[in-house]
Structure formats: C-alpha cells, structure tokens
A protein has these predicted regions:
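Hydrophobic transmembrane alpha-helices
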Residues: 2-4, 8-78
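Short helix-perturbing small/polar motifs within transmembrane alpha-helices
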Residues: 11, 25-31, 112-157
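Membrane-helix interfacial "entry" motifs
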Residues: 14, 18-22, 26, 60, ...
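Alpha-helical membrane segments and adjacent membrane-interface helices in multi-pass membrane proteins
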Residues: 62-121
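Alpha-helical transmembrane segments of integral membrane proteins
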Residues: 21-33, 67, 71, 86-91, ...
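Transmembrane helix-loop junctions in multi-pass membrane proteins
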Residues: 43-51, 85, 98-106, 152-160
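Membrane-embedded alpha-helical hairpins and interfacial helices in multi-pass inner-membrane proteins
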Residues: 51-55, 131-213
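Aromatic-anchored segments of alpha-helical transmembrane domains
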Residues: 34-42, 93-102, 142-152
Length: 213
C-alpha cells in the first residue's frame, strides 16, 4: 500500500511575516505603483477628463462623479498587492503627489481627496484582516472610498451649490464608478499583474500560483 501526501496551498494569503512586517520590497513596489498611476492620472487629467467632464456636466452636473473611480485605483491596487496597513494610503498619496507636481486643476487638494479615498480601502482591508483579494472585497473598498470622498469632501468643497437630491445622485454615481473602475478594474489589474509573475513576492502572486495548482 502506498501512502501519498498532498500539500494544500492556502488560497488566501497574508503578507510575508504578517501584515505589519513591512519589507524594503513592499515600500519600493508601493512607491513604483504610485508613481506609475500618478503619471496615468496626469495623462487622464490632461487628455481625457476635460472632455468627459464637460459632457457629463452638460447632461447633468452630478453625473461628473462617474469619473471618481479612476482616482481610487492606486489605493485599491497598492493595498491589495502589498496587503499591509498603510499600503493603500502610501500608494494613493504618492500618486496624488505626482499628479499635483505634474500639474492639475485641483492643486494640492488632491492630497486630501487621496487620503479620504485611501482611508476607505484601508478600513475594508483591516476588516478582512489584510487577507484575500476577492472581487467582493475590492468592490466594498471602492464603495466605502466613494462614500468618504463625497460625504466628507466633495459635497462641501465642489458641490456646495447642489441640492440634497443632486448630492445623493452624485454619491450614487461615485459609488457606481468606484465599483466598476476601482473595484472591478483594480481587481482585474492586480490579477493581470500577478499572472505575469511580477507579484510572486506578494500575496496576490502566491494566490495566483495557488489557483494554478
């Protein structure tokens, strides 16, 4: 009779050493992701956002919040790649800093927005103990980011003249955007990067290997 031993690889992975044990590679990777996405922000701000925003504002101003999900991407991607407390915040703030330095219409206000957006992701990651990059978790992170950004900042700074009904429509649009772009889009982007082998040092990469068997 032959005995066989199988090793089961956990399909949800914690960061190496536990969530709080930051490594140099974590910091460097988070910063690189933030810079890359900050440059992407700048391109979006310069080339696409003006036309998209003008179109949505002409139709109905609260619809402009359908663009919010673009700016929440760094928090979701950084947080779910590195999976340590502060990773989402660091990636988002680096991206916002690059965007501000390259030039945008909001100036340093993007730093406040970035912090609020990242806070939503950080809270959801903490609730799930920084374990597992499931689509539902990414979507929840996007939803909470949208709520914090709109209710704590945009309603008062950019949408002060809106009626309550318009503010609620803007909030709904922001939530939809963050579900689709930063939630689903961020989840898909991390999975795509993991499939290349570039994230093998991180939980997302190890989860990809586990899915492959």
């Amino acid at each position: 009779m032959t005995a066989t031993t199988s090793t089961t690889i956990p399909r949800t992975q914690l960061a190496v050493g536990g969530p709080v044990a930051w490594r140099s590679v974590d910091l460097v990777t988070t910063a690189i992701l933030g810079v890359a996405l900050g440059v992407a922000f700048w391109g979006w701000d310069l080339l696409l956002y003006p036309a998209v925003s003008a179109l949505l504002n002409t139709a109905f101003p609260p619809l402009a919040s359908l663009t919010l999900g673009v700016w929440v991407l760094p928090a979701v991607v950084g947080g779910f790649v590195v999976r340590r407390p502060g990773a989402a915040l660091l990636c988002e703030i680096v991206a916002a800093t690059v965007e501000a330095l390259l030039g945008n219409q909001w100036g340093l206000n993007v730093m406040i927005s970035g912090a609020l957006q990242a806070l939503g992701v950080e809270i959801i990651l903490a609730v799930f103990l920084w374990r597992g990059f499931r689509l539902g978790v990414a979507v929840l992170a996007g939803v909470l980011s949208a709520i914090l950004e709109l209710c704590c900042w945009e309603w008062w700074v950019y949408q002060g003249e809106y009626t309550l009904g318009m503010k609620l429509v803007a909030l709904g649009c922001a939530v939809v955007s963050c579900i689709a772009i930063s939630g689903l889009g961020g989840w898909a982007l991390v999975r795509a990067m993991a499939a290349t082998g570039a994230l093998n040092a991180f939980p997302a990469g190890r989860e990809h290997l586990a899915r492959r068997g």
